[in-house]
């Protein structure tokens, strides 16, 4: 995203705020765990639900951390591993197991930066973990029931994430990563320790908000009726820009319904990479369980700590570069201390079978409606006033979930029409398909196709007899041209 566009969007943000806007929202439903200028820490009356975030740090023997920090310079790797097992509750040698990824990280990093520096990295993690009782409140509410959002300082996020090293609950910790034997697991530890180094030495000052966007089907229909006759949104297609290079916008996370996907396991595709670049996003895993069809998750203000190269099995950690750090500009913070970039997690339908069967499934009215509605819920998360602030997305649900790329592009065009926002669409190097997307938008503009009309056209094209990735584009083009004849 170039400097000129960033300055244009920054000017727009003088009069708008990503949600939660603490000047307007219900303070009891939108919980502030940190002090924000003019807005104190929330004082709420809800009883802590059984699904509140575990406060295991309050039951931990702090002497274990204190003893480690007294002697870590001489204790080597084995002392840190011993600390982990003691916190996990595996005091007996026979109960313990190998942590190959952690051992490999220690060995490889010792060869690069020296063993003393690696020991310092481990000690920084322990100090952040130890600080949890001081910086975190006694009650942390998950995003369930009446609770809509949670806002933490960057420092508080670090304490929560550090504790994920010392928890042995697989779904909420790094214990599976530590037991992996893959190169990707070692790279994930590089991302994490880069994060803890930064948070120990030069932490950003500000806050991050996590919000569950809920909408009823009735509310969705009201938005649909309001905007179905609108012209389609402005769409720009980029074959070289990636979503994470942008700022002052809404970036789309191609999410799993369990937020983070395989980030705490072996996964290393779009969602997992985003969470590794911005580890603060993992706090959302602690706050949310399974995202439902009428829900989306918004994260506002996450800081980017690392860059990367590769994808999936070839993922490599890289030192942060200007290309990926645009959103870290402190001049982009709002009055609540949040960086004004939003990441919205929306989960797609998972398809199975042959390519033809996958396409047929997606073209059913039920699945088409579900995907348009899910995307629209995410794109609507910012609220009113964002008609000039882009949604930046790409091939949502087109990898492991086997979505059809042309169809997913059009679904997101419709969703941006419903939410009255421009779309910046990244095709990740697929120049040919980028050109076809642009050609379709030209066709729509030349024929004054409206938001609701495009949905009806897609819903009426009928199933293909044989599979072609371009079937949806070809069928729509034929239908539009036939109406002109």
Swiss-Prot record:
Its EC number is 3.2.1.143. Coiled coil: none annotated. Disruption phenotype: RNAi-mediated knockdown results in increased sensitivity to gamma irradiation. It holds the Pfam family PARG_cat_C. It catalyses: [(1''->2')-ADP-alpha-D-ribose](n) + H2O = [(1''->2')-ADP-alpha-D-ribose](n-1) + ADP-D-ribose. GO terms for molecular function: poly(ADP-ribose) glycohydrolase activity. GO terms for biological process: ATP generation from poly-ADP-D-ribose; carbohydrate metabolic process; DNA damage response; nucleotide-sugar metabolic process; regulation of DNA repair; response to gamma radiation. Keywords: Cytoplasm, DNA damage, Hydrolase. It is found in: Cytoplasm. Changing residue 311 to A: Little poly(ADP-ribose) glycohydrolase activity in vitro. GO terms for cellular component: cytoplasm; nucleus. Expressed in head and tail neurons. It is an enzyme of class 3 (hydrolase). Poly(ADP-ribose) synthesized after DNA damage is only present transiently and is rapidly degraded by poly(ADP-ribose) glycohydrolase. Poly(ADP-ribose) metabolism may be required for maintenance of the normal function of neuronal cells. Belongs to the poly(ADP-ribose) glycohydrolase family. This is Poly(ADP-ribose) glycohydrolase 2. The gene is parg-2.
């Amino acid at each position: 995203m170039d400097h000129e566009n960033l300055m244009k969007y920054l000017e727009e943000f003088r009069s708008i705020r990503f949600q939660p806007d603490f000047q307007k929202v219900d303070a009891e439903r939108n919980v502030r765990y940190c002090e924000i200028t003019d807005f104190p820490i929330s004082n709420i009356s809800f009883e802590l639900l059984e699904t509140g975030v575990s406060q295991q740090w309050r039951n931990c023997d702090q002497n274990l951390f204190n003893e480690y920090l007294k002697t870590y310079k001489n204790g080597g790797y084995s002392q840190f591993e011993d600390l982990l097992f003691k916190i996990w509750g595996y005091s007996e040698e026979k109960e313990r197991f190998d942590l190959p990824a952690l051992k490999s990280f220690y060995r490889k990093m010792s060869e690069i930066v020296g063993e003393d520096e690696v020991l310092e990295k481990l000690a920084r993690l322990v100090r952040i973990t130890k600080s949890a009782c001081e910086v975190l409140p006694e009650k942390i509410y998950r995003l369930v029931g009446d609770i809509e959002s949670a806002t933490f300082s960057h420092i508080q996020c670090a304490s929560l994430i550090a504790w994920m090293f010392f928890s042995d609950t697989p779904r909420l910790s790094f214990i599976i990563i530590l037991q992996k034997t893959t190169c990707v697991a070692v790279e994930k530890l590089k991302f994490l320790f880069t994060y803890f180094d930064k948070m120990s030495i030069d932490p950003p000052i500000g806050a991050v908000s996590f919000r569950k966007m809920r909408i009823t089907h009735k509310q969705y229909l009201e938005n649909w009726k309001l905007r179905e006759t609108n012209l389609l949104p402005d769409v720009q297609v980029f074959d070289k820009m990636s979503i994470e290079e942008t700022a002052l916008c809404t970036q789309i996370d191609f999410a799993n319904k369990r937020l983070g996907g395989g980030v705490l396991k072996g996964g290393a595709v779009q969602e997992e990479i985003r969470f590794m670049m911005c580890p603060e996003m993992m706090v959302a895993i602690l706050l949310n369980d399974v995202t439902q069809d009428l829900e989306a998750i918004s994260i506002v203000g996450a800081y980017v700590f690392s860059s990367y190269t590769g994808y999936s099995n070839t993922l490599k950690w890289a030192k942060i570069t200007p290309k990926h750090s645009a959103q870290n500009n402190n001049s982009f913070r709002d009055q609540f201390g949040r960086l004004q970039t939003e990441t919205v997690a929306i989960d797609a339908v998972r398809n199975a079978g042959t390519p033809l069967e996958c396409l047929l499934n997606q073209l059913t009215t039920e699945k088409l409606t579900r995907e348009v509605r899910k995307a629209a819920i995410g794109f609507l998360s910012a609220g009113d006033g964002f008609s000039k602030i882009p949604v930046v997305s790409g091939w949502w649900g087109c990898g492991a979930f086997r979505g059809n790329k042309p169809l997913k592009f059009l679904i997101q065009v419709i969703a941006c029409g419903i939410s009255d926002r421009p779309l910046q669409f990244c095709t990740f190097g697929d120049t040919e398909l980028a050109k076809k997307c642009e050609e379709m938008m030209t066709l729509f503009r030349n024929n004054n196709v409206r938001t609701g009309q495009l949905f009806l056209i897609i819903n009426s094209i009928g199933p293909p007899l044989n599979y072609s990735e371009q079937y949806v584009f070809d069928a729509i083009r034929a239908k539009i041209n036939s109406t002109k004849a």
